[in-house]
Amino acid sequence: FDTPLQWPMLTHWLHNMDQDNALSMLCSLDFVNNKQDKVKIIFVPCYLNGNDGIFNIPYYDLILGNDLCVYPSYYEPWGYTPLEAVAFSIPCITTDLAGFGIWAQHVLAYEKAENSLENGVKVVHRTDYNYHEVADEIRDAVANYALLTKTQVAKAREKARNLSKKALWKKFIAYYEDAYDMALRKAEERTK
């Protein structure tokens, strides 16, 4: 094919393309996948279930092909995607607006480990008002990760996997059982 697509970074037409925030931002930043561009964007706005028409590979198989995952969440009560990444030994960047990011910060602080991709996860502070700082911090983290040696990357991947093991359900269930017990006791007190 020698005729470029109208939107060369987009794999699927969107219902309201002119109102899509991600596509609008890509266009405003002139990410159009020119030959000379060092960064190429593949925007796949669909559920990766193995029948998306582009990859045709289930999400969990596709994630294994990543060197690094970036999930700059604005809000997620827990945020499974960063946890899924580290469970597959893929270091990731997330934010402190995702429950996983908050939890990972606490784990890193408890272990007196630096908040960096070399430790498997980088948690970026995000608010309503620091968009550019978040973008800069993510850019710097990705650039620094690209400079790591193969040995350092292997260690980061191992640390990512080890972090995920601390988030196994068998480790968290006790907290849910305690909360459930507390709720039952309080409900019982109210009915007396």
Name every feature range the model reports, one short phrase each.
Residues 1-61, 123:
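Nucleotide-activated donor-binding/catalytic signature segment of Leloir-type glycosyltransferases, i.e.
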Residues 60-77:
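Acidic donor-binding loop of glycosyltransferase active sites
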Residues 72-164:
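Catalytic binding pocket for nucleotide-activated donors in carbohydrate/polymer assembly enzymes
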Residues 169-192:
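C-terminal alpha-helical cap of glycosyltransferases
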